[in-house]
Structures are given as structure tokens and as C-alpha cells.
Amino acid sequence: MPNYVFDKFRAVIAKVNPNQTLRVSMLGPSGVGKTSLLATMYDRLENVIVHADLQVQPIEEAADVLYEQKIRLERLFSTDGLIPDQTAGIYSTTGWRAFDFRLGRRGKNATLQLEFVDYPGGWIDHEAGPQEKQWVLDLLRESDAILIPIDAPALMERNGLWHDERNRPDFVFKFIQAAYENLRSPRLVILSPIRCERYLNDPDYEADMVEKVQLGYRKLLGHLSFGELKELIAVVIAPVQTLGEIEYHGSPKDRYFPHFRKTQPNAVYSPRDSEQPLRYLMRFAMRLHRDKRQSGYFTLIRNMFKGDEYLIRAANEFATGCKTNSPFAVLQGQEWLDVARRGT
């Protein structure tokens, strides 16, 4: 990859005012659904946040891209029968992209910027070059949160036979392990099973999902649960039904090639819980804002809200909508998600 691509990214990072930006990095292999999750989150967010005195103002380019991706997801439902449109869906990402959203009170200038960074999943696999791998490491180190999409059928079916191949948990573990060396400030890690409609509509599967995530990411979770990492990192499971009315319907026995079906011929695009990762992010930010410690990181978080108590209350109200019952779970770091607690 040409050096100028990396230089451009670093210039963008330098230009953004860190006092106003919460950065979230996607982390997952190619084809796992990182961009689909972002598009679904953006679409659902506008519908959910209307109930709070908050407004989201996507930067124009980000809105255009995610809207186009949402249209492609909607096209999956354009057929008359149960088989989705096989030509629709989202193509693999070919380059990195930052999706920026400004958050503020309705009718006021935005005071907080959320930045979600997506990139080709191939940049974390064994064929990636040293520049790509270093790029991802730099991004993870500079991010306040990491969002890890998980292909749920690969995790859940046939005792997780295809999980390692599809979700690459060892690659995810190694990158986070390297990125969080000598960590000194809190971080949030969100494990987000997607394409999980079949399992969340079946009580037996639903109860099994948390256990399967913990088993499938046992190296990562074990590493984060010791010493200073345990004290600094919050880890949550937040599944997202990215389509709503399309479910996993099987795969050939000899390879992972999943087939999906609409739940009914007139099924429609109706994602569910796709705002939950953002609710957890805001809950994390609100907890840090309440912390009175004077270290640089906590000061930066407090400066994001600029003493706007009205915005703080509205953001806090939105953040308290986090789901915590199974299959949602806080695995560690509850203290970094307790918005009622004040630091010392």
C-alpha cells in the first residue's frame, strides 16, 4: 500500500481536535460485516435518538456512504418469495474510511464528535503487510473503544466449526494484546454478534449466545481479565439484528457458505438493537465525564461536554437505555459503565 495513504490518515487524526472526539475502531476480518453494522447503526440511531433531546449531524460524506449501504441492505428484501435478492448486500471495503457524526442538543451547535473508523478486514490477516498491520495497531491505540462484529452463524452452528475461519478470534486477540500494552487509560471493548436473528428469536439459542461468545473469544477475554487491564477495560456483549426479518437457513457441510431466508414473503428491512453499541459508548463516556481525577484522559472527556449540563443530562438519558439482560452482558468493567458513580 502506498505510503501516502498512511500519511493522509495520520494527517486526519492530527487535524481532529481530541478534546471533542470519541473514536471507535472496527476490528474484524474481511466479510464479517463491519460496514453492514455501521450502516445499520446509523439508520437505527436516527429513529431512536429522536426520543431524547439530542441531534445527530452526520458529516455529509459519511451520511451519503452509509445511506447508500443501507439501500443495498434494503434491496435484499425486494424479491417476492423467501429467498433474498442474491445481488444485493454490501461489498467488501477496499480502503479505510472515517465516519464522523456530530452530537449535540437540538437547535444548538454540536459539541461532541463521534468517529467510527472502518478499513479492509484483510489488513489484520496473515497476508497483510507490515504497514497495514501497523496502521491498525496505531488506530486501536488511539481509539476510545473497539467494536468487534461477530458472524453469529459461524459462531453458533455446528459447535462453532467455522468460527476460527470466519471471525479470526486469534487475530483479534493478537491485535488487541499488542495495542493495549502499557495501557494507562480506560477503554471499552464491544463484542457484537450480527446476523443473529435466528438465535434471538429462539429462547434456547438466546441463552446459549453469551456462553458461545465467551468460549469463542476465551483467549482475548482471559487476557483482558488480569492485572491493570482488568482495572481499565470494560467488555460488553451487544448483539445486533442487522436485518431483522432475514435469518440463517443453513450451510453446506463441507464449507461455510451460509444461506439466508426471509421470515415471510413480505418481510421488510427492520434492524433491531443496532443502537445498543452506541448507547454503551455514551454510557462509557458519561462515566468518564463524572470522574474527578485530573489525569489528561479524564480531563479530555470532561472537556468534550464543555460544561453543558443540559447536554449531559440528555446524553445520560440516552446512555441509560443499555440492555443488560441475556444475550446482552457486561463481562467486566461495570465500574466504567456505572453512570451514577463518581470517581475520586
Language model regions located:
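Short, flexible loop/turn elements at secondary-structure junctions
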Residues: 28-30, 103-107, 120-123, 197, ...
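Switch II of P-loop NTPase G domains
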Residues: 87-147, 155-161, 170-174
